Each structure stands twice: as C-alpha cells, then as structure tokens.
Amino acid sequence: MERFVDAAPGVRLWAEERGAPDAPVLLLVMGAQASGLGWPDELVELLAVRHRVIRYDHRDTGRSTASFDEQPYPLTALAEDAVAVLDAFGVERAHVVGMSMGGMLTQLLVADHPERLLSAAVIGTNALSSTPYVAPDGHRIPPEELPGVSPELMELWSRPVEDRGPEAELERRVEHWRVLGGDLIPFDAVYARELERRTIAHTGHHHAGTAHARADYSGMERTEQLAATGVPTMITSAPAEPVAPAPHAEHLAQVIRGARLVEIPGMGHALPREVHAPLAAAILDHTGRN
C-alpha cells in the first residue's frame, strides 16, 4: 500500500508498506539521493516474510517533495522525517535498517529517539562519534584518520553532473553502481540498469539530484548517546566497501554500546542480487533476537 506522509510544513513524503499488517514493523532508510526504491523489491519481499516493511522516499528523491533550493535543511531533518513516517503509519516502535547516509540517520534515531526503536541495523557508513578506533594491536586511531572513499569512486564523484539526456544519465548511474559494488561480486549491468529504469519511472524524470550533498551536516555527532544506548544494534561489515572501508564497520561496533558485527560476504556499497539472501538472513536473525 502506498501513501503520502506530511512530514513537515510543505514536505510530503512518498511511502509504501508490504507484509502482514500485524507483523513487527521494519523501517528501511536509504542513502543520499536514493529513493525508497533503492531497496530492491526482491530484498523487500524477503524481509516482508516476517515483517511489515515500510520504505519511503527522502525529501528531494522519488515522488517526495523536492524543495531544497527554496527550503534548505540540515541532514538531521531527514532523521525527523523517519519519525514522521512511523507516526503516519501509526507505529509506536520499529526495527530500523539504514544504509549509507541512511546509516547515519539510523544512528541519529538510536541516539535521539531510542524509545521508538526495537532494534537498529547499520550498513555502509561511518560512526557519528569522536571516539578513536582501537586497532587489534591496541593502537588508537582518530576517526578522521581512518581510510576514506576509494580513489576510483572519488574520481567518479568529482566529474560534473551534466544533463545529457535520459539514456546518458542511465548509463552514468550504472557506472556508479559498478564502482560502488566493489570487485568481489561480478557486476550485473543488466540488473543495475533495470533497477535504475524503475527508479526513473518512479520519480517521473531522470535528472540527478544533489540536495543531500548540499545539506548542512553539522550537529551530527552523538558520541555519548551511542556509547550509552540500550538499542540492540547490528553493524554489517562489507569486505568490498569503497565508501566506508574497513575498519569503519569495526569502529561502529566499538562505539555503539553492545553492537554486533556481522559480515556480508562479497558485499560492497550496493545491493546486487547476490547479497539479498545473506543480508536478509542477517537482518531477520537480528530482529528475531529483539
């Protein structure tokens, strides 16, 4: 079932739910400039076997309000949007899974709205904490000194985004997914192209968005709250991760109280078919414990 959620004055978000209406709710929070369709249907269906799954379009993505140029917002507003989605669906508490920027938003929910979470799962992001990473040899490394985005991805991101028509934009996105996926799972360009065709059809246009890259990222640190949280949290470790490479997942597991670290074999910073089953199994195991 689809609906629109009034998240804030002048802001409406597209949202969809699948699964049994009386099942525990699982809220999926996607990354920057990604609509709810960033969660592939096949993965959503695996999760909906045991959950009432809700996915939604962030502001300035998909069918949601696109108004950043007129109404700039801080990234923290997107975390409050997630709470508004839960409210609109009448959900008091939910399991929350966030990927990439959505993983940052999930950390904000863990820190600022723990009473709304049954559990949290964080995929492919860095910690919102200033606590140093403790390496296996005991060496303490400040977060800002941990490895960053891969050179190939940085080069791709540095290219100007120009509107050269829908087919050129489609191919740009496919190339982006190739690099994001890493080098351990063979890249399926046909599958990536089909996912992006669905996304473009859902959005109604092919234009690339930049709002989330331009949003205010200040005020995000939650060192003390994450260290003291009681929200059961799972961190996924992806061996081919090019955005937040090792040891970012390990760092997250250290700074979030009681967090568990689970590796998804072959995974990078994308959701190809090959990771659907192991990722769904890890998420369902985690939610089943909580």
Ranges and model annotations:
Residues 229, 235-237:
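Short beta-strand/loop motif that positions the catalytic acidic residue
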Residues 120-163:
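Flexible "cap/lid" loop of the alpha/beta hydrolase fold
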Residues 258-290:
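Catalytic active-site module of serine/aspartate enzymes centered on a nucleophile-bearing elbow/loop
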Residues 242-248:
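Conserved alpha/beta-hydrolase "acid-adjacent" motif
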Residues 145-224, 231, 251:
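Alpha/beta-hydrolase
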Residues 7-66, 71:
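Conserved HGGG/HGGXW glycine-rich cap/lid loop of the alpha/beta-hydrolase fold
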Residues 76-94:
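Conserved acidic catalytic loop of the alpha/beta-hydrolase fold
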Residues 92-136:
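Conserved hydrolase catalytic core segment
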